Amino acid sequence: MTVAGKAMQSETHSPPIPDDEPDGRDVAAYVAALIASERLGHLVVHHRVLPATPAVFADPARPFSRAVAGLLTAKGIPALYSHQARATDLARAGRHVAVATPTASGKTMTYLLPVLEEVIRNPDSRAIFLYPLKALAQDQQKAIRELAASLPESARPTTAIYDGDTSPHFRRKIRDNPPHILITNPEMLHLSLLPNHENWGALFAGLSHVVVDEMHTYRGVMGSHMAHVFRRLTRVCRRFGTSPAYVFSSATIGNPGQLAEDLTGLPVTTVTESGAPTAARHFLFLNPEQSAATTAVMLLAAALKRGLRTIVYTQSRKMTELISLWIREKAGPYASRVSAYRSGFLAEERRDIEAAMASGKLLGVVSTSALELGIDIGGLDLCILCGYPGSVMSAWQRGGRVGRAGRESAVVLIAGEDALDQYFMRHPAEFFDRPPESAVINPANPAIAAKHLECAAAELPIELTDPLLADAGIRAEAERLEQQGLLLRDREGTRYFAARKRPHRDVNLRGSGGQFTIEAGGAVIGQIDEMRAYRETHPGAVYIHRGVSYLVTALDIPERRVVVAPGTVDYYTRARGQKTTEILEVLGEKQVNGVPVFLGRLKVTETVTGYERRRARGGQLLSIVPLDLPPMVFETEGLWWVIPQDVQAELDKRLFHFMGAIHAMEHAMIGILPLLVLTDRNDLGGISTPLHPQVGRACVFVYDGAPGGVGLTRLAFAKADEALSRTLAAVAGCPCETGCPSCVHSPKCGSGNRPIDKVAARYLLELLMSGKLPETDPCRPEGLISNEPPQAGEPQAADKPKAAKAKNAPGRYGVLDVETRRAAAEVGGWGNAHKMGVSVAVLYDSGLDDCITYAQDELPALYEALTRLDLVVGFNILRFDYKVLAGASPFDHRKLPTLDILERVHARLGYRLSLDGLAKATLGTQKSASGLEALAWWKEGRIDEIAAYCKQDVIVTRDLYTFGRDNGYLLFSNKAGKIVRLPVEWE
């Protein structure tokens, strides 16, 4: 039975937890009642009390200034915790530091004190405080003002929030007079500060510190983007002569220093040992008989009646809305004191909920990970995790939201049906013993790197020696952008300029694709990213927003919008689809127990082919509705296991369902990988195939779900042996017989978890682990696309121009230009070029190395000469010269091999350039006259002058052609007045 189906079932009337205790926020009494409960007590598989720990204090190596010491005294802070003292020492010394200690350990002081001290010492100094959420910025400004309140008003540091809600008037005031502490977010840094750095001179010239809060959120796609944003920030600071110290604040993760260094490319010192005290905390693991959602509703209802301030975390937007809806039905008089909270809400809705929770108006909130970060919603007593959050880090981070200010608290993990949930129900001690996962990013993601190279070049020209281009893959991306006309080299070929002035708005830092708006009745009610839009908001899908059910009536892909209408139905929907993969490049290979494992670049094609309607009560399949949606095609990184032929033969001999075995292995491995990598299964995709055409063997693929890849499967490849053993343990340890969501079923399987054979999968994994049937063939894929970047130290395009290959150069070519008798205005516009008539036509013939002039009555001879050429070159020849000729005399140019230089320029740049402009920049010459003068000469009978002018145009066009052929580029003056290169290939 599905989660939704179970959750909608009626309950017995006895309360799960006796609620006859007086209100008083007594967490211990709540926990005792839960354990003693007849309905739920026997489902508690583990209860651990984490004891309170005392504070560990330390003095900074150098005493704070009198002003800062006075701030601490006024705030009632007699001493710093040990981690605060260590981190402030580093930040005050100008070192880059990453502080990764538990939630509510006082990390704010580690960066606030050094910044305040520097501002008081040097009023010209500035700092940027970067927060991933607007609400965090509001909280931080309040904290700064409270701490600085004891200073004389004239000495208090100024602060300002600069985000999307800041009015244009205040934005201008902030730019003109930057505050000591500018509080902003990644988007504003990317979209406003960096591209307009000349308007922020006082900020960047005085920048001493950059504070990055919630660093652990900068992983995956967003982290890969931010790695480039921080490098761009470093370039701009270098332009203003500053080198600010970075201070990172993070939840406890496995690699804070490595992540900070990957984000910035700078050496970073870590502080991970917390000196903050902690209150006692109960941790309970509960494996429900009903769904996790049903159990969460029961626990929340009981907590509300006891006055416990509670947060419930769910794994999806949909489940957040459903639990919020169901608790209102169960909570009686407390129904109005609970709200849902998720990222799809509009900003003003989220702010209202945060304020109501902080004030105590709300007792409970049901949230996605959107409230995992340190937004101030007041002191909480109870955290209910409706399903394992996907990582040990997230579980501790969410649990850390409760029990602040020394209050006893409790965290209840309610297991779902997923593999990791059940894994920890069977091995609870491992949850507490496991170190937190490592966060990974992939700055080398080509799709992401290319976007930021263009942004960086728009901010400041990129020298070929710039550290941005140190990586060979990034250099290759720069060359590709140059070939596309998005980056332009200067005349000397030593610097890149951006072709566009503001490419920044085409870059979405928080996703690899764009956002779709969700509209109801003409009003925007939410947003969804492109990858999810196809699966969750396809036509006919059920979409829930703030407890209201909607039906999707249209998915408008060109306009990037989803149209929904309110609708009450007794079913939910689940997308169905199919996927294929092509191997583009092998990045790594090894063997695990004799099994070949590869890492590489993949092209994934995913098509949503339809959707299931399933009854809300019980999950019964009602119907399958076909859909006709375009495929999603993207390149990413992934790993694949090649199943040895002897292993497949062994399964076939035992009459196992081989496709069911590898399909189950794929699901189980995706489910278990979040134990090894900081991610959740929704960030990964998989494909299993009994015969991959490039490999010639059965393969199981697991890939990064984000275009370009974000490093998840790279880390999984490094831990491939552990991934295999963990997958076997998950399958073998599950008590089900034929497969379930706890081992080999996937909640997002596009084929409805068919075929699946758990028994066969277990046998398959045991054979792979045994090493008894190794694959002797290397199994390297065939038909790879060679796309190797240049090696370090290899000369780049500035040193070795991409001249046209000899085999592509024509043996005999001509250059043609035509002058007319009549102007466009005389024949009704440029569309009537065929009515203009020919005054003179000039053809340069490379075989003769001479120019021949033709009058209108000599055009048949011109046509005959053209047919003898291997290539005809012109400037606007296709749209103009050929049309003029066709109107003057019967002429069919379609069989002539033609190169139109203007057409190539337009295709590369997106706009047109004049022949005169190209000639001046490239050749240092120019046209001898203009077309208007030639028209006047025709009326005056000055044919020789027209012929001389036309011949000069032909010579200029010829020289542009040969320059581009020999050098691989032309030169032109861009919109900023810079002489830059335009790459060309005359093929």
Write out the residue ranges for each language-model feature.
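Short His-Asn-centered micro-motif
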Residues: 367, 386, 546, 605, ...
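Acidic, Mg2+-coordinating catalytic module of metal-dependent nucleases/exonucleases
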Residues: 923-982
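Conserved DEDDh/DEDDy metal-dependent 3′-5′ exonuclease domain
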Residues: 843-917
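Conserved RNase H-like, two-metal-ion catalytic cores of nucleic-acid enzymes
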Residues: 802-871
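N-terminal accessory regions of nucleic-acid-interacting proteins
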Residues: 780, 787-811
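Helicase motor core with emphasis on the C-terminal RecA-like subdomain
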Residues: 32-75, 79-82, 86, 92-190, ...
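Extended Lys/Arg-rich polyanion-binding regions
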Residues: 408-411, 417-434, 452-464, 480, ...
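Short cysteine clusters
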Residues: 734, 739-743
